Curated annotation (Swiss-Prot):
It comes from Mus musculus. Its main location: cytoplasm. This is tRNA N(3)-cytidine methyltransferase METTL6. S-adenosyl-L-methionine binds at residues 45, 49, 87, 110, 136-137, 157. GO terms for biological process: tRNA methylation.
Amino acid sequence: MASFQRKGLQARILSTEEEEKLKRDQALVSAFKQQKLEKEAQKNWDLFYKRNSTNFFKDRHWTTREFEELRSCREYEGQKLTLLEAGCGVGNCLFPLLEEDLNLFAYACDFSPRAVDYVKQHPLYNAERCKVFQCDLTRDDLLDHVPPESVDAVTLIFVLSAVHPEKMRLVLLNVYKVLKPGRSVLFRDYGLNDHAMLRFKAGSKLGENFYVRQDGTRSYFFTDEFLAQLFVDAGYEEVVNEYVFRETVNKKEGLCVPRVFLQSKFRKPPKDPAPTSDSASL
């Protein structure tokens, strides 16, 4: 088994067979069921963590390799970094970061109360270095837990795809309030034409690039254009916005699994410097 990764600015081109499959699967889930899924979104994620405990996702040790902002507290002794992990799950990204960098303080929140409990039960959890809380990012005000403009970086890693597209902007506006001017949201999520998107069976489609899994959790598959517009409309500036292509090849089985992710950085604009007394008199 081997994995190969590359980056690019264009979405993955589908094979003829893949295109035909997507064309066949155009029927949408009924409006009634879609409303039920939205209403029960938190319950479905809580049940997901009840079934899978902390075993479903692997720890994400790649984040500091891909995002230099998460390494910034290593450059100078005593330099601190304050992070918000929006949608922390059971801590697969959070705890590798806390373990690697003793100068990191993290706020972490999740939609699922059960996931938050798992984070608090983790042997590396330390309330002096991490504040974790339950939060619906589309509705609950982050300022109830995090001071305004106090965070050096926000991670949104495989989080926004689980939110209804009509509510994604609310998440971005919410984290905007706690992010320092000139600092960035670090984003990675499912990209258009990812292998997972093509595996959905007929009857799973909720809307354009939006699907429901059998367990009731939902997933959106992003294009770079859609994501850029979403962030820019919420007041951010685009820094990096590119596709990541990973192919997992099993030569023995003759399998090649094409994964597509979107990896991006969007910056909160820096504040204009206050005018000096000299410039004010001109």
